[in-house]
Amino acid sequence: MSFDAVVIGSGVIGLSIARELDNRGLKVAMVARDLAEDSLSVGFASPWAGCNWYSFAEGGTPAAEWDAITFSKLAKLAEDHPDLCEKIPFCSVWDLPKSDSESEPWFKDLVFEYKKLKSTPGQHLAGGKKFGYSFKSYVLHAPNYIRHLSSEIRARGIPIHRYRLSSIDEAYNLPGIGKVSLVVNASGLGAKSLIGVEDEKVYSGRGQTVLVRAPGFKACIMHTEGFYADLDESGREITPPPPAYIIPRPGPEGHVVLGGVYQKDNWSTLPDLKEAERILKDCYNLAPELAGPNGKSWKDIEIISHNVGLRPAREGEPRLEIEEREVGTGANGGNGYEVAPKFGCEGERRKVAVVHAYGIGSAGFQASLGMAEKASDLVEKYLSGRRTSAKL
């Protein structure tokens, strides 16, 4: 069998793109170091996500469009797989006054039942905050959704090869796949070190969460201001307080993800227990119900696990574009090629292309279906152009 394209990476972006390409009738194969069944691997971020649809993209940007496309497709997933995707109440709360443009999100007319909130004697907001807004949106079970996508892709006959690429050139002629003219680079953090890409703008956005058990808790609460700032000896604020969020998971387990942390260029995969305590305190302040009907403090919250994930972020903006290039003997020099494996760097010199789709940071799940749609548009356009040229 010959393939139209190879997708590098089996996180939520790579899997979503592979499925979309298959939907369009293209023959696709996948190659990745970490696979969906590696749900305890810290080598990729997807299994560790809190996973809700709460866009923090700036309105009118490509990222906002990806989020909107994804949102429009989640209703079907929630209907077919309520154990993977569920529509629940959301709220975002804060204390400091904001202008209307700051306090109203671009997606207020997209989500369900949006309304502005203000604390009154008769209406107290989460954490005793003064302002907020509420709506209904979707939460997903990240590790199970990744496994679901992977199982669906395998059921369609799409091969997924476990292989660690050193250079992008290798992907154009892999054993068991053969020659292709197009590769989709959804390698996430791997784009920083993959020879032939080596994107210096890519960085790790370390996240840490606490998975807890709180049966019956079904509300997603976001608090971007945080409660506790780091102070110096005189009591002055050194850094602003980290945000806090509460994201229930679909399914019967009663699991809830508590966060949050976003630490740029921190590559540690070890949980920081001091940070975990801060997360538990913050989330208890927002929702004491997490501690159960008899709970009296954050210490009564039932902890399941401490988790760390490295978000594949990128300076400026995510990268979604096509790059035309060459592979084969003499095609590339420098940029690490002197130490690259010879496989993929030798042989017939030919023109190829790569569609880059990485650097989405914290927004992987909520942007995945939109990003897959736009990446697939680029793939189709390129392959159509090659077929047209071949006929001339």
Curated annotation (Swiss-Prot):
Main location: other
Motif interval(s): Microbody targeting signal: 390-392
Amino-acid positions noted as binding (R)-lactate in the UniProt annotation, renumbered to this chain: Y245, Y262, R311, S362
Induction: Expression increases when grown on D-alanine or D-proline as nitrogen source.
Residue numbers binding FAD: S10, I13, R33, D34, A45, S46, G50, N52, R311, G361, S362, G364, Q366
E.C. number(s) listed in UniProt: 1.4.3.3
GO biological process, one term: cellular detoxification
GO molecular function, one term: D-amino-acid oxidase activity
Protein purpose: Catalyzes the oxidative deamination of D-amino acids with broad substrate specificity. Enables the organism to utilize D-amino acids as a source of nutrients. Enables the organism to utilize D-alanine, D-cysteine, D-histidine, D-leucine, D-methionine, D-phenylalanine, D-proline, D-serine, D-threonine, D-aspartate and D-valine as a nitrogen source and may also contribute to utlization of D-tryptophan, D-tyrosine and D-asparagine as a nitrogen source. Protects the organism from the toxicity of D-amino acids, including from D-alanine. May play a role in its interaction with the host.
Protein name: D-amino-acid oxidase 2
Organism: Cryptococcus deuterogattii (strain R265)
Name of the encoding gene: DAO2
